[in-house]
Structure formats: C-alpha cells, structure tokens
A protein has these predicted regions:
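Structural motif
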Residues: 6-8, 142, 223
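Histidine-centered metal-binding segments
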Residues: 328-350, 368, 372
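Donor-binding and catalytic core of enzymes assembling or modifying cell-surface/extracellular glycoconjugates
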Residues: 19, 158-252
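Leloir-type glycosyltransferase catalytic cores
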Residues: 84-132, 258-332
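Hydrophobic/aromatic hotspots within intrinsically disordered, low-complexity regions
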Residues: 318, 322, 330-331, 347-352, ...
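Basic, mixed-charge low-complexity alpha-helical segments
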Residues: 364-379
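Active-site and donor-binding regions of nucleotide-sugar-utilizing enzymes
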Residues: 1-97, 216, 231-233
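Active-site donor-nucleotide binding/catalytic segment of nucleotide-sugar enzymes
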Residues: 80-86, 113, 125-197, 248-249, ...
Length: 387
C-alpha cells in the first residue's frame, strides 16, 4: 500500500478560481488530518493572504527554497475543476468542483461562501477611495462595474472577448449612460472604455492593479455589476449585492443563482448558449456557436439598469464632507516606480476624470516581465562590450 504523504496543491488561473478554491481548502484543513499541506499559487496568492487558516500554507511559485523545503517530500496535485464531470454537466459550481477534487468526494455537497479577510488598513483605504470618488462626483451611492473577464483582448480600437463572457462595449456604454446621472460609477477594468464626455456626470476609472484594494472598494460600494469574472466572487465573499450578466457560461457553474443578494441575468440562455468545454478541448466550434450570446438588445440593457436601480434605490447628492488621508512619506506600494521623479501619491486609486481612457502602463505581471527583459538586455550589452 502506498504510504500517505502530505500534499502540495498547485492552483493555476485567475483570481476568481483562487477565491472559489478557498471553501474546499478550508474543508481540507478541517477534515484531512494533513497539517503540513502546501498551496502553490501559480496565479498569485492575493486572496489567500490574510486568511486565518490558509495563509500559512500558501506560497508564491517564486518563493525561495519552495521545492526543497515544501515540495520534495509531498504528493503533487494540480486540481482542474473544469474537468470534473459534475461541473461540465452543470451539476455543481466551480467551488464544489474544487471540493470534489481536493477532498476526494463522490458527491456534491453544500459549501459556505469564500472567505476574504481584509485588514484595517485595506478596509479604510477602500472606504476612503469610495468617499473621495463620491465627493468628487457629488453622488451618495457608488456602483462598481466590471465589464470584462480575463479573456478580453484589444484589437486596434476594438475590445473583443472571443469566449463571449464579457459585456459587449456598446452595451455596457449604454448601461453606464443610463446610470451615471444617478450614481457614482466606478469602472473596474484594465482596458480603457470609450466613455462619452459628460462634464456634469463624470465616471471614475481608477488605475489600480491591486485586487485586494479593489475588494476593499467593493466592500464599501453600494452595489456591484459584472460578468463572469473575479468581481462577482469578491462580492459574494464580502456579502454584497450584485447584478451579474452571463453569456457563454452557465450560472450554476460560475455564479450564485441561489443567493437572494445576486440578480443573475442569463442572456446566454435566451440565445441558445452551447456549453464550451474550457480547459478540456482546443476546438473553437463552441466559441463560434456562442459568438453572439452576450450581445444585448435595448430590452436586455434595460433589465440590467432596472436591476441595479432596484438594489441601489434613489440616488442623491453626496452628503457630508470628505476628509483626505494624510499622505505618508514612505511608499510601500510595490507597483509604483519609486525611481521616477514624477512619482506621487496624491490620488491613491488613480485619477477621476470625465473619461479617463488613457492606456495603463501594464499590469504588475507585465511590468515585471518588462523589467526582467531589460535586465537581460543590459547583461548582454555588458558581455558584448567585454568581447
């Protein structure tokens, strides 16, 4: 009989998958008897950080000594929830698929909501950011909108999601136009939306790559509007209300259809969605069949607007007075370029402009890759000079 070893789990994919894995790992820590298990965070450990049980088990993939100290004597497991039969047959959620694989279950079981633990600094930073935006936009209620999932790409002037999980640009612009007069609209996106000018009712587009700070903003916002992406999982973990629009994926798999605080608008079901076996086959036939399932007509757009208004209620002017946070002399944000003479901290969450659609400098991962490439070029130049 094979000797039982402690396990090391490699978790890949985006932050949404990480959040959905949390309930299964909580169960594993409670039930398995494995006190020394390891979670290797191939996609980053942002949402294991601060967790009262899981943080001590979680490591970034670049952690010094990871292999010798935490992997060599363990059985290696790479969970892939999309390949669980109950998942691709729409009998369980992403979190439950993780649970089946990580805990070796034969049947689907109910799980608690994911746990995201924000500390005092994170919580107040998010609150302050929301208050600043509300005061500048003169609105008393904030709506955070995440229009895109990870599969969206920019092709020239167009933003395209080949998997049809994100909002179509024209649709989300129309929705924003109907809501911006009532509420403080905050767009959670790495790619810039072509938001029309409106001096009286501006839209905030914070340039903030830190997802934990976005989580703190969602915690302080009055409502969340999104698609099949990380924001809805953050909203669930923080017990917030959400309107979620779904196209090519299926609500039972990727969202929370039994939660009264979630209004799921399933556009894909109305348009004959065909399940796409993500991470199983490379055939694009399903994506082609689903190519138009997120394209909304005016009636669909109005359903989204009405849903947000139902949760938010009547919008008013900002009440009270915003008190800015006193700036510190030391910057601890690893995403900032501290050697830049123009490096400032005046607006911690980026500018609030009429249409802040300037391109970002790149994600943290992209910037690090660029820095590594630059160092490599410098090293090669030094070798050339020596020769």
């Amino acid at each position: 009989m094979k000797k039982s070893r402690s396990k090391a789990f490699f978790i890949s994919g985006g932050a949404g998958r990480v959040i959905c894995s949390i309930p299964a790992f909580e169960k594993y820590a409670e039930e398995s008897g494995d006190k020394d298990f390891t979670i290797v965070c191939e996609g980053g450990m942002d949402f294991y950080r601060g967790h009262p049980i899981l943080q001590k088990h979680a490591y970034e993939v670049w952690h010094k000594g990871l292999f010798d100290q935490h992997l060599r004597n363990k059985d290696i497991v790479s969970p892939e929830p999309y390949r669980i039969n109950e998942y691709f047959n729409q009998k369980c959620s992403l979190a439950q698929a993780f649970d089946i694989e990580i805990n070796g279950l034969e049947e689907v079981r109910e799980l608690s909501a994911p746990t995201i633990t924000l500390n005092k600094t994170e919580t107040i930073t998010g609150y302050q950011a929301l208050q600043e935006i509300k005061s500048q936009l003169n609105k008393d209620k904030a709506l955070i909108i995440q229009p895109f999932g990870r599969t969206v790409t920019q092709m020239g002037e167009y933003l395209i999601d080949s998997s049809s999980r994100s909002f179509e640009v024209g649709n989300i612009i129309n929705i924003i136009e109907q809501l911006r007069e009532k509420y403080a609209i905050i767009v959670m996106a790495e790619l810039a939306l072509p938001i029309p000018d409106n001096e009286k009712h501006k839209v905030a587009v914070p340039r903030e790559p830190n997802l934990r700070l976005w989580a703190s903003m969602i915690k302080s916002a009055e409502h969340f509007l999104g698609c099949d992406s990380v924001g809805q999982h953050i909203a669930k973990a923080l017990d917030k209300t959400a309107t979620v629009v779904i196209g090519s994926t299926v609500p039972i798999n990727i969202s929370y259809p039994d939660d009264d605080k979630f209004d799921i608008i399933d556009i894909g079901a109305d348009k004959g969605r065909n399940y796409a076996p993500i991470r199983m086959t490379m055939d694009d036939e399903k994506d082609r069949q689903n190519d138009e399932v997120m394209m909304m007509n005016e009636e669909d757009e109005q359903r989204v607007v009405d849903s947000c208004i139902k949760f938010l209620g009547k919008g008013k002017e900002f009440q009270g007075q915003f008190t800015p946070t006193q700036q510190q002399n030391v910057c601890t944000n690893p995403d900032h370029n501290h050697s830049d003479p123009n490096h400032t901290h005046n607006v911690p969450f980026g500018s609030i402009a009429n249409t802040d659609t300037s391109p970002k400098e790149g994600t943290r991962k992209e910037r690090r890759a660029a820095e590594r490439a630059e160092r490599k070029d410098q090293k090669l130049n030094l070798l050339d000079n020596k020769e």
